[in-house]
């Protein structure tokens, strides 16, 4: 539908890379990132993150894709700049830290004011409208992402929906950019105002957090009364209104998105009477307390933590639920050792990192893991996990 466009992705994390590679099948894409190591890997057709499809596409597909640390080179000729920088939740202000997004917007406005900026970073409700008014510009479109870490490119190739936070001809053209690189056909597309698009992202993730919290609470109840959690979940989820998905018990919801998005939604609507959303946050804390108490009932001298990552197939442990378990166990004076091959150094959270898996298994009285692995099959009698379905 288009000629070849020049598209820059700012931020080479899983959101930026999955969008950049999607579009590099048909257009000229430059990935901008401040980390030279990431840029060097990408220019060598290697992925800096763990994502099977990203690794495969970089190494085997014909892509018009390169990376740079030079923002002037990245932005100066771009038709579109996709902003995918991190917006961590700031507990002090009860808001997302949007400074990285704002910095990109200012840089692009200075270097290439004609570029259309597409914000993929998760932002507070009302952010896009406010910054457009504040800077006196109109070339910003918010389009939320619904990607899983470790499967980000797959989710862009097979999207559940495409949401564009603007109702205009240029919004329709943007939707086509996301569609033309996808494998899935007949993708639902919804055009909304920017504020509604921002709310869609936060409410979607908050619902997922609620679902995780519900099945975790079901599991806590079942474990407390000696019931078979799996049988209960199977029976509940045969109801098509409930569905057999996102129902595997865990140590709590975690990862990069669900904790911060739920808290941001609470902050956005703190003036609105609510019980459910605040209860989700409380339920997640309660789950971690429950898991910790179950572990401590075994009276271990040494608790071994197998992997910090939140999901299998991911290389990220930001806000992983097991971190909260570690803190609680250590507060009780119990020694914790950790096996996490992704971390360099000798300690994490002031707990020793054990490099050799066999030695780790031998030292631990009980091994806890959020998600099971075949590596633990030989010591399954001392493993504690609530992973019933072997999925995320």
UniProtKB/Swiss-Prot annotation:
It comes from the Bacteria. Pathway: Nucleotide-sugar biosynthesis; UDP-alpha-D-glucuronate biosynthesis; UDP-alpha-D-glucuronate from UDP-alpha-D-glucose: step 1/1; Capsule biogenesis; capsule polysaccharide biosynthesis. It catalyses: UDP-alpha-D-glucose + 2 NAD(+) + H2O = UDP-alpha-D-glucuronate + 2 NADH + 3 H(+). The active site is at 257 (nucleophile). Its EC number is 1.1.1.22. Phosphorylated on a tyrosine residue. It results in a significant increase of the dehydrogenase activity. Keywords: Capsule biogenesis/degradation, NAD, Oxidoreductase, Phosphoprotein. NAD(+) binds at residues 6-23, 33, 38, 87, 122, 149, 256, 260, 318. GO terms for molecular function: NAD binding; UDP-glucose 6-dehydrogenase activity. Substrate binds at residues 145-149, 201, 205, 246-250, 254, 311. It holds the Pfam family UDPG_MGDP_dh. GO terms for biological process: capsule polysaccharide biosynthetic process; UDP-glucuronate biosynthetic process. Belongs to the UDP-glucose/GDP-mannose dehydrogenase family. Catalyzes the formation of UDP-glucuronic acid which is required for K5 capsule synthesis. This is UDP-glucose 6-dehydrogenase. It comes from Escherichia coli. The lineage of its organism: Bacteria, Pseudomonadati, Pseudomonadota, Gammaproteobacteria, Enterobacterales. The gene is kfiD.
